[in-house]
Amino acid sequence: EASKILHSLHDRYPDIEIAVLPTRYPQGAEKQLIQSLTKREIAPGQLPVSVGCAVFNVSTYAAIYRAVRLGVPLTQRIVTISGEAIAEPQNFIVRIGTPFHDLIEVAGGLNDKTERVISGGPMMGFAQKDLSVPVIKATNSILCLLKDVNGAAENPVCLRCGKCVSVCPMRLQPLYMYRYAKCENAKELSRLALLDCMECGCCSYICPSHIPLVEAVRSARNVLEQEVSK
């Protein structure tokens, strides 16, 4: 439906090319989009500008339009509240700074058996224990779950199956990154190009041992960034 609307407007903006890509996660990530649309590959540690590209999402473009053409600053955004644990899933136009618990209340409240509330999506979102946290400019979704979709184990053991490597869109080695992240080995993490990880969550999702690979990478990223900045 969105594609039809865009194509119907194409005659008014002939200098804009519209491309429809297959739905395949994480196709929407900037490096994957650039590779799919231009066949240009960004080298490890580089940014899109290094291959002459800039990527903006729909919300950013809309905010730029309102600011430049209408003189309206970014004070609100669209937030989706969904999941089995929310009474009335829906979309809201929300003022930045609105507490999560206010939105959840307007959406009918949480189920008594709610186990987790996530800011963001199921693959890249962050669990929120404090629902007084505010909506920020990057908040696009609040996901309310009845059970832990990741099924994390208490003492997970790597089986060396290699599935996490096979699904990584950045061609990294999550199993080794996890090992060195646990012992905060900055040298090896740098060698493995940890900073190129986009935290898409594919490795954690496919892991048969339910190892929290992305969680470990996020923690290690802070350690490595501190070492790089020295």
Please state what every model-predicted region is.
Residues L21, S82-E84, R95, I118-G120, ...:
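Generic beta-strand/beta-sheet core signal
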Residues E1-S36, R160, L194-L195, E199-S204, ...:
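Iron-sulfur-cluster electron-transfer modules
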Residues P26-G28, Q32-E41, G108-L159:
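Active-site gating/interface segments in enzymes
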Residues A2-F100, V106-K113, G121:
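Hydrophobic alpha-helical positions that pack around
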Residues N140-N155, V165, P169-K230:
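Ferredoxin-type iron-sulfur electron-transfer modules in oxidoreductases and energy-metabolism complexes
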Residues E1-K4, V55-A63, Q76, A87, ...:
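Conserved active-site and cofactor/substrate-binding residues in soluble primary-metabolism enzymes
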Residues I5-S8, A63, A67, D102-V106, ...:
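Alpha-helical scaffold segments in soluble metabolic enzymes
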